[in-house]
């Protein structure tokens, strides 16, 4: 079985990776596949630490979501917007223990850096012109919004 990766919203989106498969990802019922990954939204309210814990308890190797390219970010944003319309989500990017060394909770390399660092937030812009912002406090949430 592949590794599982999660996105939590204050509500929750779950992602898992099916290693060794190519274009034809066979996801469980109720899940959506994209590039060797399966995605599912869970509408559960929780803080960041509880969301990460929830994710790790779902499947071996599961964590809050990590993003690695703009296409994956677009896919995730579309899934989130279709479920939440407008909402707050948790992701695995954190600096909880690293003192300014940002990393993903699943240990993946921080290879997608399409953000602008401002005084108090990160802003990811996807190809579809969605914005994903992240406050720099460890327990702040990602917010999704369309640019005005």
Curated annotation (Swiss-Prot):
GO terms for molecular function: toxin activity. It is found in: Secreted. InterPro entries: C-type_lectin-like, C-type_lectin-like/link_sf, C-type_lectin/snaclec_domain, CTDL_fold. Interferes with one step of hemostasis (modulation of platelet aggregation, or coagulation cascade, for example). Residues 1-23 form the signal peptide. Its main location: secreted. Expressed by the venom gland. Belongs to the snaclec family. Residues 34-148 form the C-type lectin domain. Shows greater sequence similarity to the beta than alpha subunits compared to other heterodimer snaclecs. It comes from the Eukaryota. This is Snaclec 4. SMART domains: CLECT. Heterodimer; disulfide-linked. Keywords: Disulfide bond, Hemostasis impairing toxin, Secreted, Signal, Toxin. GO terms for cellular component: extracellular region. It comes from Echis pyramidum leakeyi (Leakey's carpet viper). Contains disulfide bonds. Gene3D superfamilies: Mannose-Binding Protein A, subunit A (3.10.100.10). The keyword Disulfide bond applies. The lineage of its organism: Eukaryota, Metazoa, Chordata, Craniata, Vertebrata. Pfam families: Lectin_C.
